[in-house]
């Protein structure tokens, strides 16, 4: 399971160091794609396959399903770690998530999320302020 928060910088070649604790779980080859809230999602191959199978069950007749799967899959890219534990993030994904230098990499159960530090600070502060309300809303999910 991925968990924790780490800060790293993207170098001038668009490479990002993946935290050592995440490398083994991600494996040598994994998938990175556009996430929600202007971040990137990265999935180990096994988790990506599970997600892909679920998304393939969405009805093609639903416009939202078509739009979501187009957006999600068109941004997907297979990545691999180099010998220094870095990934080269495709330029379209760097642009989507406004990633320039300072990043925050967080573990979220079955995936990691890659955020620009400024965007993460905004999202985190907003969640922190409303955490009690968020927790109350999760009661219906048996958490």
Curated annotation (Swiss-Prot):
* Keyword Transcription regulation listed: yes
Record keyword Protein biosynthesis present? no
Keywords of the record, alphabetical order, are: Cytoplasm, DNA-binding, Repeat, Transcription, Transcription regulation
What the entry lists under InterPro entries is as follows: MraZ (IPR003444), MraZ_C (IPR035644), MraZ_dom (IPR020603), MraZ_N (IPR035642), MraZ_sf (IPR038619), SpoVT-AbrB_dom (IPR007159), SpoVT-AbrB_sf (IPR037914)
User: Where located?
Assistant: Cytoplasm, Nucleoid
Of the GO CC terms on this record, one is: cytoplasm
Q: Output the Gene3D superfamilies linked to this UniProt entry.
A: Transcriptional regulator MraZ domain (3.40.1550.20)
Query: Superkingdom, according to UniProt?
Result: Bacteria
- Enumerate the spans annotated as SpoVT-AbrB domain: 5-47, 76-119
Q: Name one GO molecular function term.
A: transcription cis-regulatory region binding
Biological process according to GO: negative regulation of DNA-templated transcription initiation
Task: Show the SUPFAM superfamilies listed in the entry.
Answer: AbrB/MazE/MraZ-like
A UniProt-annotated Pfam family: MraZ
Say which family it is in.
Belongs to the MraZ family.
Please name the NCBIfam families in this protein's record: division/cell wall cluster transcriptional repressor MraZ
Q: How does it assemble?
A: Forms oligomers.
Name of the protein in question: Transcriptional regulator MraZ
